[in-house]
Amino acid sequence: MSYLETTDPEIAAIIDKETNRQINGLELIASENVVSRAVLEASGSIMTNKYAEGYPGKRYYGGCEFHDMAENLARDRVCSLFGAEHANVQPHSGSQANMAVYFTVLKPSDKILSMNLSQGGHLSHGSPVNFSGIIYESHQYGVDLKTERMDYGTIAEMARTIKPKIIVCGASAYPREIDFKAFAEISEEVGAYCVADIAHIAGLCATGIHPSPVGLTTFTTSTTHKTLRGPRGGFILCDKEFAAPIDKAVFPGMQGGPLMHIIAAKAVCFKEASTKEFKKYSEQVVKNARTMAETLSANGVRLVSGGTDNHLCLLDLTNFGITGLEAEQALGNAGITVNKNTIPNETKSPFVTSGLRVGTPAVTSRGMKESEMKQIGEWIAAIIRDSKNTRLQETIREEVKSLASQYPLYPDLT
């Protein structure tokens, strides 16, 4: 028996159940991935025992010499990966990375211009229920409701009228390439700071599959646990002129002690992301997403914007007479994990929605390619068309389990 099974059998049993769920199912949530065993090992390492408030060379506690080495390595690796001048790897999440940037250059009631949450944005980009929409005056752009793509001309007009202090570019449910150069030019024209939140596409930006904002925007924020395939956490990239204020905004402005076991795991993830193998992985993520999009479209499922350029597809379920919530539950019964999602022209609550978001990072990490995406797309379409058919869900669940067994989550983990 493991130490955990002996000490806390209840939690051990829950973890075993979650392990089996992941092993036997298909994770298609676009913000999820499967970390390497090396990242898992670092995340659960003895580094968790140490308090390390401050930064390398300027800690408030003794005994941090090896934590300094780990954090410096993480900072150096992510700067090298993205070609950045400065990195802060201490934010516990992407939202906290965004918060630190706001705290650096904004005062309460300053104006933010960012993407509307219901059309693909993120809570921390100025949603009225989030700190970013409570502390600051939030203005939001959306997509062109015909093309369902960003209209940079309209965004520029809004920026000229609103004159925001910050323009945020980035999304959590936008399947198309983002023109960071256009955002940088708009920001420069109106005298705004430009913040690129690449949480979803960081792995694609790091490998050149998607254009990177680094060197164009004032700040770049991200998570490490989506397409970067690292531990749960965030980071900030900026030029050296903002290094000191950004670091001060993170600590002591926003956080106390950093999670050093997670920072060690971030360092591992940045090393992995610099390899040729990771670039091939990132290329396959996009190939898989496009194949799934084509399969779904061929089966009568309308895709928001008509397809995808990245790791995710956004499905419009309106013509099938079911909600995103109903589809999420039906697919979940079949062992396919997705999430309900709002779509442009949304008429339903965000807890119900008219759409689904599906992504390929996790299944690609398991080794699946185009042929598997075609099969998965067929399963999704079949369940969407007949969402009340529990016998169909049970049949597909067995087929999903069979497919998943061919691509072990971790070959040495049972």
UniProtKB/Swiss-Prot annotation:
Pfam families: SHMT. InterPro entries: PyrdxlP-dep_Trfase, PyrdxlP-dep_Trfase_major, PyrdxlP-dep_Trfase_small, Ser_HO-MeTrfase, Ser_HO-MeTrfase-like, SHMT-like_dom. Pathway: One-carbon metabolism; tetrahydrofolate interconversion; Amino-acid biosynthesis; glycine biosynthesis; glycine from L-serine: step 1/1. Its cofactor is pyridoxal 5'-phosphate. It comes from the Archaea. (6S)-5,6,7,8-tetrahydrofolate binds at L117, G121, H122, L123, S349, P350, F351. GO terms for molecular function: glycine hydroxymethyltransferase activity; pyridoxal phosphate binding. Its main location: cytoplasm. One of its GO terms (cellular component) is cytosol. It catalyses: (6R)-5,10-methylene-5,6,7,8-tetrahydrofolate + glycine + H2O = (6S)-5,6,7,8-tetrahydrofolate + L-serine. Its EC number is 2.1.2.1. The modification N6-(pyridoxal phosphate)lysine is found at K226. Keywords: Amino-acid biosynthesis, Cytoplasm, One-carbon metabolism, Pyridoxal phosphate, Transferase. It is found in: Cytoplasm. The keyword Cell inner membrane does not apply. The record marks H225 as: Plays an important role in substrate specificity. GO terms for biological process: glycine biosynthetic process from serine; tetrahydrofolate interconversion. HAMAP family: SHMT. Catalyzes the reversible interconversion of serine and glycine with tetrahydrofolate (THF) serving as the one-carbon carrier. Also exhibits THF-independent aldolase activity toward beta-hydroxyamino acids, producing glycine and aldehydes, via a retro-aldol mechanism. NCBIfam families: PRK00011.1. Homodimer. Belongs to the SHMT family. This is Serine hydroxymethyltransferase. It comes from Methanospirillum hungatei JF-1 (strain ATCC 27890 / DSM 864 / NBRC 100397 / JF-1). The lineage of its organism: Archaea, Methanobacteriati, Methanobacteriota, Stenosarchaea group, Methanomicrobia.
